[in-house]
Amino acid sequence: GCTDVRHILVEDCLFWNAEFGNTLEIGYETRCDEITDVVFRNCDVVHCQYEGNQSGGVLTIHNADRAHVHDIVYENIRIEDAQEKFIDIKTLDSKYSRDRERGMVNDIFFKNIEITEGAFPVSIIRGFEMKNEVCRPHGFYFDNVVIHGEKVMSPGELHMVVELSDELKFQ
């Protein structure tokens, strides 16, 4: 079996993401029971390249297997060039999936996040629904998210598509 993931800190880092991938990501292969207490703090994203195929996101969680992903914190993150997606959180079935069931995503915190320049791309939070399975990511907290000097206070202001998900709170 796979080992659960807990107590991870990514701090004081500088990122440049080229094609094929996401910058600060959890996923796709989430083949454990739990991923929790992961903190991305005080990081600078200089570049996140346009990829054109489910990648190219700056702050991402792609839960394509069974894990319960929760209590994840993105804090004090500065972004200069986000070309394709800003926030991309999905529970999904993908080419990387091996588990039959999909996991849950909840209690995700975004605090002091800023796109300082460059494009202002779309954000996505999407759940999963099949015949007998519904996974609704929930509990997303946005505290002082700033785009080009303007604080955002709603999914619309964040250019966010929300499907099969709920409990988004802005302050």
Question: What is each PLM-predicted segment?
Answer:
Residues 1-171:
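Extracellular/periplasmic carbohydrate-active domains that bind, remodel
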